[in-house]
UniProtKB/Swiss-Prot annotation:
Pathway, per record: Glycolipid biosynthesis; lipid IV(A) biosynthesis; lipid IV(A) from (3R)-3-hydroxytetradecanoyl-[acyl-carrier-protein] and UDP-N-acetyl-alpha-D-glucosamine: step 1/6
Catalytic activity: a (3R)-hydroxyacyl-[ACP] + UDP-N-acetyl-alpha-D-glucosamine = a UDP-3-O-[(3R)-3-hydroxyacyl]-N-acetyl-alpha-D-glucosamine + holo-[ACP]
GO biological process: lipid A biosynthetic process
GO CC annotation, single: cytoplasm
Function statement: Involved in the biosynthesis of lipid A, a phosphorylated glycolipid that anchors the lipopolysaccharide to the outer membrane of the cell.
Pfam families: Acetyltransf_11, Hexapep
Subcellular location: Cytoplasm
Gene3D superfamilies attached to this UniProt entry: Hexapeptide repeat proteins, Udp N-acetylglucosamine O-acyltransferase, C-terminal domain
Protein name: Acyl-[acyl-carrier-protein]--UDP-N-acetylglucosamine O-acyltransferase
Record flagged with keyword Lipid biosynthesis: yes
Length: 263
Protein backbone atom coordinates (compact mmCIF):
# COMPACT_ATOMS: atom_id res chain seq x y z
CA UNK A 1 0.00 0.00 0.00
CA UNK A 2 1.14 3.56 -0.71
CA UNK A 3 -0.18 6.95 0.38
CA UNK A 4 -0.01 8.18 -3.23
CA UNK A 5 2.16 7.26 -6.19
CA UNK A 6 5.75 7.86 -4.99
CA UNK A 7 8.46 8.94 -7.40
CA UNK A 8 9.41 5.45 -8.55
CA UNK A 9 11.52 4.65 -11.58
CA UNK A 10 9.64 2.37 -13.99
CA UNK A 11 12.30 -0.35 -13.69
CA UNK A 12 12.02 -0.54 -9.89
CA UNK A 13 10.14 -3.47 -8.36
CA UNK A 14 7.92 -2.67 -5.37
CA UNK A 15 6.11 -5.42 -3.47
CA UNK A 16 2.38 -4.64 -3.12
CA UNK A 17 2.63 -4.94 0.66
CA UNK A 18 5.42 -2.35 0.97
CA UNK A 19 4.36 0.99 2.45
CA UNK A 20 6.09 4.05 1.05
CA UNK A 21 5.33 7.66 1.96
CA UNK A 22 4.08 9.74 -0.95
CA UNK A 23 7.38 11.55 -1.58
CA UNK A 24 9.73 8.56 -1.39
CA UNK A 25 12.02 8.28 -4.42
CA UNK A 26 13.12 4.88 -5.74
CA UNK A 27 15.81 4.68 -8.40
CA UNK A 28 16.30 2.42 -11.38
CA UNK A 29 16.40 -1.35 -10.90
CA UNK A 30 15.87 -1.18 -7.14
CA UNK A 31 13.83 -3.77 -5.26
CA UNK A 32 11.57 -3.00 -2.30
CA UNK A 33 10.36 -6.25 -0.77
CA UNK A 34 7.40 -7.32 1.31
CA UNK A 35 6.81 -5.83 4.76
CA UNK A 36 8.99 -2.78 4.18
CA UNK A 37 7.92 0.62 5.52
CA UNK A 38 9.75 3.74 4.29
CA UNK A 39 9.13 7.19 5.76
CA UNK A 40 8.73 10.57 4.12
CA UNK A 41 11.62 12.24 2.34
CA UNK A 42 13.66 9.07 1.92
CA UNK A 43 15.55 8.44 -1.31
CA UNK A 44 16.48 4.95 -2.50
CA UNK A 45 19.08 5.12 -5.24
CA UNK A 46 19.58 2.75 -8.17
CA UNK A 47 20.23 -0.97 -7.78
CA UNK A 48 19.35 -1.07 -4.07
CA UNK A 49 17.52 -3.94 -2.42
CA UNK A 50 15.49 -3.53 0.77
CA UNK A 51 13.95 -6.66 2.27
CA UNK A 52 11.49 -6.89 5.14
CA UNK A 53 10.54 -6.89 7.83
CA UNK A 54 12.27 -3.50 7.74
CA UNK A 55 11.16 -0.11 9.09
CA UNK A 56 12.91 2.97 7.73
CA UNK A 57 12.24 6.48 9.03
CA UNK A 58 12.30 9.90 7.37
CA UNK A 59 14.83 11.67 5.16
CA UNK A 60 17.26 8.80 4.67
CA UNK A 61 19.43 8.41 1.57
CA UNK A 62 20.46 5.04 0.16
CA UNK A 63 22.90 6.02 -2.55
CA UNK A 64 23.24 2.93 -4.74
CA UNK A 65 23.71 -0.84 -4.62
CA UNK A 66 22.95 -0.94 -0.88
CA UNK A 67 21.60 -4.26 0.43
CA UNK A 68 19.34 -3.56 3.39
CA UNK A 69 17.32 -5.91 5.59
CA UNK A 70 18.74 -9.13 4.20
CA UNK A 71 18.75 -12.40 6.10
CA UNK A 72 21.33 -12.59 8.90
CA UNK A 73 24.60 -14.29 8.03
CA UNK A 74 24.18 -16.82 10.82
CA UNK A 75 23.87 -20.56 10.21
CA UNK A 76 21.46 -20.85 13.14
CA UNK A 77 18.94 -18.67 11.32
CA UNK A 78 16.03 -20.83 10.15
CA UNK A 79 13.77 -18.32 8.46
CA UNK A 80 12.05 -17.00 11.58
CA UNK A 81 10.61 -13.48 11.54
CA UNK A 82 13.21 -10.91 12.57
CA UNK A 83 13.50 -7.24 11.69
CA UNK A 84 15.61 -4.19 10.98
CA UNK A 85 14.72 -0.70 12.18
CA UNK A 86 16.46 2.40 10.80
CA UNK A 87 15.76 5.90 12.11
CA UNK A 88 15.89 9.29 10.37
CA UNK A 89 18.42 11.35 8.41
CA UNK A 90 20.93 8.58 7.71
CA UNK A 91 23.19 8.44 4.65
CA UNK A 92 23.87 4.90 3.44
CA UNK A 93 26.46 4.81 0.69
CA UNK A 94 27.35 2.35 -2.06
CA UNK A 95 27.32 -1.41 -1.37
CA UNK A 96 26.52 -1.05 2.34
CA UNK A 97 24.93 -4.16 3.87
CA UNK A 98 22.75 -4.10 6.99
CA UNK A 99 21.22 -7.42 8.06
CA UNK A 100 18.15 -8.21 10.14
CA UNK A 101 18.42 -9.70 13.63
CA UNK A 102 18.28 -13.28 14.85
CA UNK A 103 16.06 -14.97 17.39
CA UNK A 104 19.06 -15.64 19.63
CA UNK A 105 20.08 -11.98 19.58
CA UNK A 106 16.72 -10.41 20.33
CA UNK A 107 15.36 -10.54 16.80
CA UNK A 108 16.22 -6.99 15.77
CA UNK A 109 19.00 -4.87 14.30
CA UNK A 110 18.71 -1.12 14.91
CA UNK A 111 20.30 2.00 13.44
CA UNK A 112 19.54 5.38 15.01
CA UNK A 113 19.52 8.85 13.46
CA UNK A 114 21.95 11.01 11.48
CA UNK A 115 24.56 8.35 10.78
CA UNK A 116 26.89 8.17 7.80
CA UNK A 117 27.80 4.69 6.56
CA UNK A 118 30.29 4.92 3.73
CA UNK A 119 30.92 2.43 0.94
CA UNK A 120 31.11 -1.29 1.72
CA UNK A 121 30.24 -0.91 5.40
CA UNK A 122 28.76 -4.10 6.88
CA UNK A 123 26.44 -4.05 9.90
CA UNK A 124 25.69 -7.63 10.91
CA UNK A 125 22.69 -9.18 12.63
CA UNK A 126 21.58 -7.91 16.05
CA UNK A 127 23.84 -4.85 15.99
CA UNK A 128 22.63 -1.65 17.61
CA UNK A 129 24.04 1.61 16.26
CA UNK A 130 23.32 4.89 18.02
CA UNK A 131 23.14 8.40 16.56
CA UNK A 132 25.57 10.74 14.76
CA UNK A 133 28.11 8.02 13.95
CA UNK A 134 30.47 7.92 10.96
CA UNK A 135 31.57 4.56 9.57
CA UNK A 136 34.24 4.99 6.91
CA UNK A 137 34.72 2.71 3.92
CA UNK A 138 34.81 -1.02 4.64
CA UNK A 139 33.89 -0.71 8.32
CA UNK A 140 32.81 -4.15 9.53
CA UNK A 141 30.67 -4.86 12.59
CA UNK A 142 30.23 -8.53 13.48
CA UNK A 143 27.01 -9.75 15.04
CA UNK A 144 25.64 -8.34 18.29
CA UNK A 145 27.91 -5.26 18.35
CA UNK A 146 26.60 -2.15 20.13
CA UNK A 147 27.85 1.29 19.06
CA UNK A 148 27.16 4.43 21.09
CA UNK A 149 26.49 7.95 19.83
CA UNK A 150 29.10 10.03 17.98
CA UNK A 151 31.42 7.09 17.33
CA UNK A 152 33.82 7.39 14.40
CA UNK A 153 35.21 4.22 12.81
CA UNK A 154 37.90 4.68 10.20
CA UNK A 155 38.35 2.71 7.00
CA UNK A 156 38.93 -1.05 7.15
CA UNK A 157 38.35 -1.11 10.92
CA UNK A 158 36.11 -3.62 12.64
CA UNK A 159 34.67 -5.02 15.84
CA UNK A 160 34.43 -8.63 17.03
CA UNK A 161 31.00 -10.03 17.80
CA UNK A 162 29.35 -8.91 21.06
CA UNK A 163 31.74 -5.96 21.50
CA UNK A 164 30.49 -2.60 22.70
CA UNK A 165 31.93 0.70 21.49
CA UNK A 166 31.20 3.58 23.83
CA UNK A 167 29.97 7.04 22.87
CA UNK A 168 32.52 9.42 21.28
CA UNK A 169 35.08 6.63 20.76
CA UNK A 170 37.35 6.66 17.72
CA UNK A 171 38.76 3.62 15.93
CA UNK A 172 41.72 4.39 13.69
CA UNK A 173 42.20 3.07 10.18
CA UNK A 174 42.48 -0.71 10.19
CA UNK A 175 41.87 -0.98 13.94
CA UNK A 176 40.34 -4.24 15.14
CA UNK A 177 38.83 -4.64 18.58
CA UNK A 178 37.94 -7.87 20.36
CA UNK A 179 36.94 -6.16 23.61
CA UNK A 180 34.69 -3.35 24.81
CA UNK A 181 35.95 0.15 23.98
CA UNK A 182 35.12 2.67 26.73
CA UNK A 183 33.52 6.00 25.83
CA UNK A 184 35.85 8.75 24.53
CA UNK A 185 38.69 6.28 23.84
CA UNK A 186 40.81 6.10 20.70
CA UNK A 187 41.91 2.70 19.41
CA UNK A 188 45.08 2.33 17.35
CA UNK A 189 45.94 0.19 14.38
CA UNK A 190 47.63 -2.95 15.67
CA UNK A 191 46.98 -6.65 15.07
CA UNK A 192 44.36 -6.20 17.76
CA UNK A 193 43.65 -2.58 18.59
CA UNK A 194 44.96 -1.03 21.79
CA UNK A 195 43.85 2.16 23.55
CA UNK A 196 45.72 5.23 22.35
CA UNK A 197 44.37 8.06 24.47
CA UNK A 198 41.25 10.19 24.43
CA UNK A 199 39.49 11.55 21.35
CA UNK A 200 40.17 15.12 22.49
CA UNK A 201 39.84 16.77 19.09
CA UNK A 202 36.46 15.20 18.48
CA UNK A 203 35.26 16.26 21.92
CA UNK A 204 36.31 19.87 21.28
CA UNK A 205 34.40 19.88 18.01
CA UNK A 206 31.30 18.71 19.87
CA UNK A 207 31.50 21.50 22.44
CA UNK A 208 33.21 19.80 25.38
CA UNK A 209 34.99 22.45 27.45
CA UNK A 210 38.48 22.13 28.95
CA UNK A 211 37.18 21.09 32.37
CA UNK A 212 35.21 18.17 30.97
CA UNK A 213 38.08 17.00 28.77
CA UNK A 214 40.53 17.21 31.69
CA UNK A 215 38.26 15.01 33.80
CA UNK A 216 37.98 12.47 30.98
CA UNK A 217 41.76 12.42 30.51
CA UNK A 218 42.26 11.85 34.22
CA UNK A 219 39.85 8.92 34.10
CA UNK A 220 41.69 7.48 31.10
CA UNK A 221 45.03 7.68 32.93
CA UNK A 222 43.47 5.93 35.91
CA UNK A 223 42.18 3.13 33.72
CA UNK A 224 45.07 2.69 31.31
CA UNK A 225 48.26 4.45 32.45
CA UNK A 226 48.42 4.01 36.22
CA UNK A 227 48.93 0.25 36.00
CA UNK A 228 46.11 -0.47 38.43
CA UNK A 229 44.13 -3.71 38.52
CA UNK A 230 40.70 -3.10 37.06
CA UNK A 231 39.02 -3.43 40.47
CA UNK A 232 41.23 -0.69 41.95
CA UNK A 233 40.82 1.51 38.88
CA UNK A 234 37.05 1.30 39.19
CA UNK A 235 37.25 2.42 42.82
CA UNK A 236 39.18 5.52 41.80
CA UNK A 237 36.81 6.18 38.92
CA UNK A 238 33.90 6.02 41.34
CA UNK A 239 35.47 8.88 43.31
CA UNK A 240 36.12 10.91 40.16
CA UNK A 241 32.56 10.28 38.97
CA UNK A 242 31.21 12.26 41.91
CA UNK A 243 32.27 15.45 40.15
CA UNK A 244 31.97 14.42 36.48
CA UNK A 245 28.96 13.08 34.61
CA UNK A 246 31.28 12.01 31.80
CA UNK A 247 33.38 9.86 34.12
CA UNK A 248 30.19 8.47 35.61
CA UNK A 249 29.17 7.39 32.12
CA UNK A 250 32.54 5.71 31.60
CA UNK A 251 32.21 3.85 34.88
CA UNK A 252 28.67 2.71 34.11
CA UNK A 253 29.88 1.42 30.74
CA UNK A 254 32.68 -0.54 32.41
CA UNK A 255 30.40 -1.96 35.09
CA UNK A 256 27.96 -3.19 32.43
CA UNK A 257 30.63 -5.17 30.57
CA UNK A 258 29.77 -8.79 29.81
CA UNK A 259 33.02 -9.49 27.99
CA UNK A 260 36.59 -8.25 28.45
CA UNK A 261 37.38 -4.55 28.44
CA UNK A 262 39.93 -3.43 25.86
CA UNK A 263 43.06 -2.76 27.93
Amino acid sequence: MRDQAPLIHPTAVIDPSAQLASDVRVGAFSLIGADVHIGAGTEVGPHCSIHGPTRIGRNNRFIGHAAIGGEPQDKKYAGERTELVIGDDNVIREFVTINRGTRGGGGITTVGNDNWMLAYTHVAHDCHVGNHCVFSNNTTLAGHVTVGDYVIISGFAGAHQFCRIGAHAFLGMGALTNGDVPPFTMVGRESLGRPRGINSEGLKRRGFDAERITAIKRAYRTLYVAGLPLTDAKLQLAEQAKSSDDVRGMLEFIEAAERSLLR
